A protein has these predicted regions:
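Extracellular/surface-exposed low-complexity repeats and stalk/linker segments enriched in Gly/Pro
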Residues: 3-51
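Surface-exposed ligand/attachment interfaces on beta-rich extracellular proteins
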Residues: 24-39, 70-95, 106-144
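Short, surface-exposed terminal/edge motifs of secreted or surface/virion proteins that either
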Residues: 41-71, 99-101
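Acidic glycine-/aspartate-rich tracts in secreted/extracellular proteins
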Residues: 49-52, 61-65, 105-108, 143-148, ...
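Generic beta-strand structural signal
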Residues: 59-61, 93-94, 167-171
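Extracellular jelly-roll beta-sandwich "head" domains, especially the C-terminal globular C1q domain
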Residues: 85-89, 112, 118, 123-218
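Extracellular beta-strand-rich recognition modules
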Residues: 100-105, 178
Length: 218
């Protein structure tokens, strides 16, 4: 037997052993492939295409029960309300089971909102003159939601506290609002906001970025 044949046989044997051990490779998400439904619990799948930023998947149950064990969506822009200043942006990212938010876009990385009562301004009723929504009700995308609401802090360029930022969880409409200690001005924008780190664990299925883009969430 030639060396080439020996190596080919060895390669085939190793591939068979890897497959038997539950490690598979392919292109695309396994949770969208009917042919993967019958794979045993504990199977590990590597997506060579890194679809939606997910690299490694673990089969956790029967059918299409898969969990991403290594993945990163990268920063994705989130649809915002018109309460934001024109230069401001909101981005979201999921790494593994942790969701991160970023608020900035302005000069020196500041975040800002428009004046109270301005065109498109979206007030938040329970905050009165002191708050507005920056991500609309239902605006947090699937795959990035939290069952529990989260509260962070806002600062005037890091010097003093402006107020709080509130992220409503699945039990409270999946939106984000900001609330200030003082009334939001009616004659000028507030452009020098710094927002504290806002992140949390999620147990939602891995997001489908193409679907979210088509739906206008990102």
């Amino acid at each position: 037997m030639s060396l080439k044949n020996v190596l080919e046989n060895l390669s085939g044997f190793v591939a068979a052993e890897i497959a038997a051990a539950g490690v598979l490779k392919g292109d695309g998400r396994p949770d969208l492939k009917p042919e993967m439904d019958g794979k045993p619990k504990g199977t590990i799948y590597k997506d060579n295409s890194v679809t939606d930023g997910a690299v490694l998947w673990l089969k956790t149950g029967n059918g299409r029960n898969w969990k991403v064990i290594s993945g990163d969506t990268g920063w994705q822009p989130v649809r915002r309300t018109n309460s934001l200043a024109a230069s401001s942006s909101i981005k979201i990212r999921r790494m593994g089971d942790t969701v991160f938010w970023a608020f900035g876009g302005g000069q020196w990385g500041w975040f800002g909102i428009t004046r109270r009562g301005g065109q498109g301004y979206d007030g938040h009723g329970s905050f009165g003159n002191k708050g507005c929504k920056i991500v609309q009700v239902g605006g947090i995308p699937d795959g990035f939601k939290t069952p529990n609401s989260v509260v962070g802090s806002m600062y005037k360029d890091g010097l003093k506290q402006y107020g709080t930022i509130y992220l409503g969880g699945m039990s409270d409409s999946n939106y984000i609002a900001v609330g200030f200690i003082d009334d939001i001005p009616t004659d000028r924008e507030t452009l020098d906001i710094r927002v504290s780190a806002l992140n949390y664990p999620t147990d939602q299925e891995w997001p489908r970025l193409d679907v979210l883009r088509n739906q206008g969430f990102i």
